[in-house]
Amino acid sequence: MNFTGRTAIVTGAGRGLGFSYARLLATLGANVVISDVGADKLGAGGDGSIAMHAAHTLKDKGLRVVGHHGDLSTEQGCQQLVEKAIEAFGQLDILIHNAGWVGYQPIEEADALFMGRAVDINIYTPVWLCKFAWKYLKHSTAARVVLTSSDRAMYQHYAQPGLVAYAAGKMAQLGIMNALSIEGAPVGILVNAVSPVAKTRMWGVTEAPENLKPEWVAPGVAFLASQQCKDSGYVLRASNGQFTATRFVENPGVDYPVDLARVRAASAEQVAQRWNEIKEC
């Protein structure tokens, strides 16, 4: 797979999964902007050395990368990142929004600051990034956007107490993916998402793991960012070197919104009586 001549922005790329994505893309020939605010595990604070160190590490290997330290929770910060990519490499073909954080807060203790950080990085940031990247992506011969979701949000089976802020943000990115995959289709911009599992500092892991390695997720993300990927609106679940793709699809025979082609009920009592049928549809 060859990314020579293509330019990618990877957010949250100073460490963990994002660094693995950036390193693989750069190794495959891409120009890469490594963006990272250097926040802690709860999305607070900042350390400008994180992105710069990651960029220098790859530059020392002869790869074409630049570092970017900025606050992507603001519209202005996202615009500056896109402009950084254009200034450095003259084009933009790939946008990978990986930045995020995992924090637990019971619902009865939910507060605006905690929720706000989740909303910023998971909703505002991808929207603002796409807003400013869009005009450049439209000129690319193979424009790709990769957002980030989580099985902890998508599947009740994997949900955990205290993850309301995290789950809300990760599910929001699926809505953004669906909307932008439709908006991008006429101009050739493909929008997908990855739902990764990897042992990183978010898990409190500081040493190289023996399994669930971040670098084992990277090939899937590289594919979504590549010219070989021809699909849009998919979620790529990636864990331990294994991959499965899924997306939201409608039931056969539906004429939305006038006919769901399923169980009819005219009262709450009928809904209750036919609930077993309804939930199996």
Predicted regions and their residues:
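A glycine-rich helix->loop->beta "capping" turn
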Residues: 3-4, 61-66, 84-97, 103, ...
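Active-site loop of short-chain dehydrogenase/reductase
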Residues: 6, 63-64, 91-92, 137-151, ...
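Catalytic Tyr-X3-Lys loop
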Residues: 101, 108-127, 146, 173
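Amphipathic alpha-helical dimer-interface segment in Rossmann-like NAD(P)H-dependent oxidoreductases
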Residues: 121-141, 181-182, 186
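C-terminal helical subdomain
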Residues: 209-281
